[in-house]
């Protein structure tokens, strides 16, 4: 099924966990779904999230496959094989945390961990029909997570229920606690373009739930996407550019990395300004609403 990159048995807790193979586990190589890293040294210490899991009644049973170098949203891995989408075998699993999402859809673990820079937890969760969460940036430790330097990447869980997502978050972030709220949450829908089938499905659900939500606009939405991609491209080239010389990277990721090499520091600085404007808009909306609904797959 190409879901599992490597099996293991670490810890003896009651919760079974699989983690994306871009997270260090002591004594194992972190290959990030790429043949170009097959000869890398084994990790000398556990990533901080692994330490947290082992301190909270968990057993780590496997590393999961991913879109090569976590640089893609389809989950297709031309180097090591693409994880099958258990619920929809004819469709892509989504990426980059494809194996982590597919493992949950196949009921191979209680929860799994992935990483999300520009949708890499949210996309595969949507594609595989499971729950996935990208926490607030900086909330969950990235120590021991690859690439080492990222200004957008987050570690986040996948599970088959919201309750298990909450449990996973309590394990990987000691400060996390489920919010208690007596009143109904104030929600709004972000106005983004989407396929009519997606729009109709959401409206159908809201109607059945007897919910009428306001629609809100974000002026910097499209420019924020472009800015995010510039930052991601620049940082991935810094992290993995040297690997393009090995001849061992799949054609799709090789092409994306070589294109990313053209991203300049001037572009990144401008992108950071857009990021700040976008963050300001979102923060203002979250002063009024508890959550904003946005389609993951449009």
Task: Please name every model-derived segment.
Residues 14-32, 230-274:
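Short helix-loop capping/hinge segments that flank enzyme active sites or metal/cofactor-binding pockets
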Residues 297:
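Conserved small/polar residues in nucleotide/adenosyl-binding loops
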Residues 1-42, 46-47, 52, 67-72:
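Short, well-ordered alpha-helical
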Residues 199-216, 241-247, 268-289:
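Acyltransferase
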Residues 37-41, 153-160, 260-263:
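Short, well-ordered beta-strand elements within core beta-sheets of diverse protein domains
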Residues 170-230, 262:
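Gly/Ser-rich, acidic/histidine-flanked active-site/gating loops
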Residues 46, 54-169:
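Short glycine/serine-rich loop segments
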């Amino acid at each position: 099924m190409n879901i599992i990159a490597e099996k293991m048995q670490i810890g003896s807790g009651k919760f079974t966990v699989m983690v994306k193979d871009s997270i260090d586990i002591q004594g194992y190589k972190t290959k990030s779904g790429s043949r170009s890293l097959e000869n890398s040294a084994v990790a000398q210490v556990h990533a901080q999230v692994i330490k947290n899991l082992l301190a909270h009644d968990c057993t780590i049973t496997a590393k999961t496959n991913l879109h090569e170098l976590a640089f893609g949203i389809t989950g297709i891995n031309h180097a090591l094989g693409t994880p099958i989408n258990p619920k929809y075998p004819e469709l892509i699993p989504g990426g980059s945390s494809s194996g982590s999402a597919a493992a949950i859809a196949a009921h191979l673990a209680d929860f799994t961990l992935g990483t999300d820079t520009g949708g890499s937890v949210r996309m595969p969760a949507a594609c595989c029909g499971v729950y996935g969460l990208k926490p607030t940036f900086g909330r969950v430790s990235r120590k021991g997570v690859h690439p080492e330097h990222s200004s957008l990447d987050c570690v986040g869980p996948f599970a088959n229920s919201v309750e298990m997502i909450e449990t996973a978050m309590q394990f990987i972030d000691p400060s996390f606690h489920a919010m208690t709220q007596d009143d109904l949450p104030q929600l709004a829908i972000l106005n983004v373009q989407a396929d009519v089938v997606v729009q109709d499905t959401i409206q159908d659900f809201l109607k059945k739930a007897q919910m009428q939500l306001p629609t809100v606009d974000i002026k910097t939405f499209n420019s924020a996407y472009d800015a995010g991609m510039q930052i991601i491209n620049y940082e991935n080239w810094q992290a993995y550019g040297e690997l393009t010389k090995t001849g061992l990277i799949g054609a799709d990721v090789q092409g994306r990395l070589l294109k990313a090499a053209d991203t300049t520091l001037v572009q990144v600085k401008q992108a950071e300004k857009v990021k700040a404007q976008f963050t300001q808009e979102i923060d203002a909306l979250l002063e009024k609403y508890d959550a904003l609904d946005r389609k993951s797959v449009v």
